[in-house]
């Protein structure tokens, strides 16, 4: 078994963790349950042959039923943590900002649809491997079908690792440096 959830504890709270302008100006905290092994797969495709046009990105977050169930479990765990006696001095009574009240399946589903966002570790848009969906050769990190182009970042990871991607990306970069220098 490998972990399928990670909990990010933040010393700020907001409905959108990336919109600092809308964060309340008083004490609070957030627990973000994060999927470590998502099954949902999005797409990145070219809008046109023009270099100055942004690609079409469809993340398809939570399109896999298993991801929705895992995240619901994570939300319940986070709520249990916040409501535990260890957090009594950190919240006002039993106050939770959202979703408030009874946690029905509908309330949890609505919150997931409104508040889900990508947190820190997107991978796989230039997957390395030998299968038909692989873009990069795992032995050279070169993009198949193009000359002179390697991908050296988290986008070559076929799947997100259970944990933060920084150390793995450093290892990918070290391998790429060895490949380039040994040429």
Q: Which functions belong to the PLM regions below?
A:
Residues 1-168, 176-183:
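FAD-dependent oxidoreductase catalytic-site/capping-region signature
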